[in-house]
Amino acid sequence: MSRSMNKFSPILSYAVFAFSVSIILLCSVSVIFPALIQSVTSEFSDFPFYTPLVDPFELGVLAVPFVVLNGMILLIGIVYYKKHFSLGRLFDFDVSNRIAMIAIAIILSVYIAATVGEFAVEESWNDFSRIQSVVIDRGIENLQGFDLYVKYTLLTVSLNFFGDMRVVPFLASIALLVTTFFIAKEITKKRVPGIIAMVLVLQSNIFLSYDTSATYSNFWILFYVLSLYLILRKWQLSHMSFVLSIFSKSLSAIFLPMTMFFVLNNTKGRRRIYLTVSYGALMIAGVFAASNSNIMFGDATYLPENFTKGIESFSYQLRFDPIILIFLLPLSVMLFLKSLRGFSQANSIQVLISGFMLIPPLLITFTEQTNEPYRLIPLVVFFAVGVSTLLGKIKQDEP
């Protein structure tokens, strides 16, 4: 892997960590005190007659385990870093490619067997009727402008070949699990961390809530994660996957800054120049086309109070994913310490994690979009990848 930014790694690592930990701490406030942000930011809080309905300092359900486990893990991590204890023997273990493929096949088989029963029940999301109208009544041949061609084409294929629009989205969710394995494997150069990353995504309640949904399909996430993997493996194809992500969900376009950081932090030489110029050109072309088509500013607004609502909703939307809620902060610290030892990819993962935490509040602040939990699935993926990198021994990190 590239170490092209190592010369500036201490400054970069501190800057990335400051950005990342600030967002995580802000979002973690509602884990400990669920009503605090709302009571402070209420539009009536300045009135003398205002009385909060609940105690703003009432502890949340996960407050105690959050504080205790975070304290323990951070203490262990700092002692490990300061004392230079070696866990190399523990993380030297890996499995052969054959065993890894067998393990993946078993995991996916269990997942498929446990999920296939969902197809006996109709999808109940409110927007499902709108998706049906586009696919069945309107037809993909009548799509115009910046419509989601990729998403609706894949849904149409699913309906025509399988008789159910949810089959191909389910296959995309399986492909997302496999892609998560490969990107973690590519970063760590080991298979065990890849398997762990895949399992961490699979145990997520948010992932399992939308894995068979045609309304909120995972096409956009799959193509975006694949575009990052291709930067590391087959960079010439990365742009194609990113464009497919945009035409699966236009929200993917605002991931470009994170992609640019990933490129600069993980490539060098001609590859870096080519990817930087091409992604930069893609960004400029996208902004120009979007502004002329009135799709970028069509629902633009400014509702500053929504930013705090978006921050506050973070713990609520992840309430059934306690592993992510509790371990995000120590993961950020561990990735920071790992980056100080020369593992520059830790900075990329921190930027991706914090970026996907920040996008939902910003989206509902500057547009009329609603805050939906499915937008946190990329966070789940990169949380899993981040954890997997800690469990893999990276030779370049060792003193």
What residue spans do the PLM features occupy?
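Short acidic/glycine- and proline-prone juxtamembrane loop motifs at membrane-interface regions
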Residues: 209-217
